[in-house]
């Protein structure tokens, strides 16, 4: 059974990585060029809340690797997104999957990522944070909804999986 659970975990991480990667290609526009906000932020928060830190970080690493391979991200993008993920995971670690987590982990992660970005590029930190405020509000408003949707999807998959498991001694064990 270990092989089945490993294969299931690999598939789950791969699918979540694809979800992060594809949603990162959609961005909320910004007044300043280059300051767009990725739609993947609330989805990433939801993945952490529903699937836990380990799965979230692994899916994020795979997503970043895919972005590098496709050329849609560079090392700076990957570093900033990893900082966002670490901040979200830290909030999850200390608060769990509650309302506070879904409301504030995304904006906290974005805040720390923008502060780090300002240190790297040498621009005013508060200007970068101010440019991200619309995206932070978007994440604050939508992460809980994304978490509900992912939670319902996970629950349906688990119920389907449990319903399809039959015991060898059970009568009418036909598939």
Q: For each of these PLM feature ranges, what is it?
A:
Residues 1-175:
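Loop-helix junctions at membrane interfaces
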């Amino acid at each position: 059974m270990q092989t089945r659970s490993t294969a299931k975990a690999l598939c789950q991480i791969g699918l979540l990585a694809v979800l992060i990667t594809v949603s990162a290609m959609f961005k909320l526009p910004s007044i300043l060029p280059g300051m767009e906000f990725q739609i993947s932020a609330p989805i990433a928060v939801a993945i952490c809340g529903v699937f836990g830190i380990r799965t979230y970080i692994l899916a994020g690493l795979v997503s970043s690797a895919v972005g590098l391979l496709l050329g849609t991200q560079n090392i700076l993008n990957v570093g900033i997104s990893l900082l966002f993920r670490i901040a979200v995971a830290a909030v999850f670690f200390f608060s769990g999957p509650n309302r506070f987590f879904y409301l504030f982990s995304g904006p906290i992660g974005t805040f720390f990522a923008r502060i780090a970005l300002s240190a790297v590029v040498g621009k005013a930190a508060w200007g970068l944070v101010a440019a991200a405020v619309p995206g932070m509000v978007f994440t604050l408003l939508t992460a809980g909804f994304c978490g509900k949707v992912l939670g319902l999807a996970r629950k349906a998959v688990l119920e389907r999986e449990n319903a399809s498991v039959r015991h060898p001694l059970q009568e009418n064990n036909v598939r």
